[in-house]
Amino acid sequence: MRLPIILVSPARAENVGAAARAMKTMGFTEMRIVASDAHLQPAARWVAHGAGDILDGIRHFDTLADALSDVDFSIATTARSRAKFHYYATPQQLLPMLEEKRQWVGCAALIFGREDSGLTNEELELADVLTGVPMVADYPSLNLGQAVMVYCYQLSALMQQPPVENVAGDGQQLNALRLRMAALLHRLEVADDQKMVDWVQQRLGLLEQRDTAMLHRLLHDIEKKLPE
């Protein structure tokens, strides 16, 4: 399973360099950047110190949605609670989650937001799972480079495992399930209940492969019973 690190609108070249260095140290190889050219500044390469190959391989995108176009499962980091988001995985909880996903997902991604404001609610909604680092309240944030290091360290075991031969098409099960669920809620005329819609969408990413397949079967049976 590929696991690119996505930085959304990083402002400081030094932070991009620090993130690249953290990735290199822990065995990660692919970085994507959204709406920023900070990685092109000399300071990024100076701080990267030996991780120039990661900077050289950076893929740039205009939007986060574009950066996720080939991603089957995405995890977004956030440092603060948003009222509409209720479940946050810790970095430690992500490892078993991704170890299960790697059996059927070809590409996952870990997303980091802006240094000053993080990810917008609209960007967080693009992710399958949200995660945050529990911290002491009087010092409630990590800088970008530190945050990337924390997550890369926690997930480094994934980089040491041999690749898994994925079943064709399985990686798209989650996205297909999201679309199917949204369509069903619309047919049931409950799509305007935003609280319920948010609750459903936030929990689909937590499903394992067997659960995802079973829910597809259940939705299929429900769809057959509904009038056209």
Task: Map each language-model feature to its residues.
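Post-transcriptional modification and biogenesis factors for structured RNAs
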Residues: 1-228
